[in-house]
Structure formats: C-alpha cells, structure tokens
Amino acid sequence: MTPASAYLTDVRVQFEKMKKLAEGALAQVTDDELLATLDPESNSLAVIARHMAGNLRSRFRDFLTTDGEKPDRNRDGEFEIEGSPTREQVMKDWESGWQVLFATLDTLSDNDLLREVFIRGERHSVIQALDRQMTHHAYHVGQIVFLAKHLRSAEWRTLSMPRRRQRP
C-alpha cells in the first residue's frame, strides 16, 4: 500500500466513523427533539444534518471538475426548515449527502491527491480539500452529539467508553 492509498483509506474510515457517531446520537432522540433548538439562534439536529448533507452534495458532486460550491446549492436554505420534516425525510436527505461523498472517495486514485480543486474559487489540493471537509464535519458531528446528549439528559446512552470504566 502506498502512502497515498493509505491516506485515502484512512479518510474513508474517518468519515465512516463520523457518520456512525452522528447516527448513534440521532437515533437516541425523539422525533420532537430532532427539531428542537436551545434558543432562537441555535440549529436543531435536523438543520445540522440538512446542512451537512447539502455541504457534502455540493463539495463532492463532480469533485475534480467543478467548484465545490455549486451554483444550485441554497446554503442559507439549509438552515431554514419549513414545517416539520419527518425523521425519515431528515435521514433520507442525510444519507444522500454521504452517498455522494463515498461514491467520490471510491473513484479517487493516488494520483488525484495533488490535483487542484476549487471551493468558492479558492484553490486547494485534493488532500487539502479532504482535510477541510473532515474538519468541517467533525465540528458538526460534535454539535450533533452534544445537542443530542443534552436533549436526552439522563436517558443518554454513551457512544464511547462510559465514565469511570477501566480500560481492558
């Protein structure tokens, strides 16, 4: 395995872990909690999931050949949810973004890593663009876990090693 292919494998593994962590948190909340906000300026879990999905679809559709900020993306609209989407609608949207990401990752070769891509007109190597996306998504996954844990309170089931537990 080359260092480049090891990197691509690790990127996929890290994104898979982030997706699983967020889904573990989202699965614990009620349908009402999925739409709840802490205050008028905060985002609900559904809004965060919608934004992440929209970001993935924009960044990774035609990744190597078009700017990552697609003209048909309505970023501001990702933060405005009209009505009360169902859990199924939220998760269908969520999954569609991840499918675009993973399909693109599956097509990248070692030689693609030093190619240039653009995000909002800013030049990045593919490595930089992937790292930028991992950072962005880790931030939002942290928000999802924090908000879900807050909403579930005493009913929260940890997604990692519980406190006061010895490691084997």
Regions found by a protein language model. Give the residues of each.
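Acidic/histidine-rich alpha-helical segments that form the ligand environment
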Residues: 79-117, 127-137
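Short, charged, low-complexity loops and linkers
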Residues: 1-12, 80-82, 89
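Short, contiguous alpha-helical
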Residues: 8, 12-16, 20-26, 31-78, ...
